[in-house]
């Protein structure tokens, strides 16, 4: 048998005519001889602060806030659970990225912390996570503890924040 030949209907596309004219677009009013409009934030500039570049180490997502209270931690962990992320706990005595033996990044430069037990798959209650944080604090009182929200569908870490700082660390984040 001979193969059937189908007639395809070709659609014509209009040829490219170049960019459209901007003559129909509104022109913003320009004042002054420089052609730039003056933008002012008014009195709001006086209340803005710049984060110091020396002496204060930054941690995770919520590091610019004061230490989280138990209620605030519960709310953050509850958000993590409602977002269908798996809570994980990690701890480290250093808590910062550092390069001690080599100038290139590697496994032992502080980016990877030790995981506490296993990820809490199936966890539905934020108090379960905080109970585990308390266990880490008892076992390693001089270690930083962070909570991680892991999305097991996309295989990515979605959120990470410090849940506990050791007593030797000042509350502002100074080491």
Curated annotation (Swiss-Prot):
Record-linked InterPro entries: RuBisCO_ssu, RuBisCO_ssu_dom, RuBisCO_ssu_sf
KW Plastid (keyword) present: yes
Residue range of the transit peptide in the UniProt record, numbered on this chain: 1-46
GO molecular function (one): ribulose-bisphosphate carboxylase activity
Principal localisation: plastid
Role: RuBisCO catalyzes two reactions: the carboxylation of D-ribulose 1,5-bisphosphate, the primary event in carbon dioxide fixation, as well as the oxidative fragmentation of the pentose substrate. Both reactions occur simultaneously and in competition at the same active site. Although the small subunit is not catalytic it is essential for maximal activity.
Family per similarity comment: Belongs to the RuBisCO small chain family.
PANTHER family: RIBULOSE BISPHOSPHATE CARBOXYLASE SMALL CHAIN 1, CHLOROPLASTIC, RIBULOSE BISPHOSPHATE CARBOXYLASE SMALL SUBUNIT, CHLOROPLASTIC 2
HAMAP family from the UniProt entry: RuBisCO_S_bact
UniProt miscellaneous comment: The basic functional RuBisCO is composed of a large chain homodimer in a 'head-to-tail' conformation. In form I RuBisCO this homodimer is arranged in a barrel-like tetramer with the small subunits forming a tetrameric 'cap' on each end of the 'barrel'.
Name of the protein: Ribulose bisphosphate carboxylase small subunit, chloroplastic 2
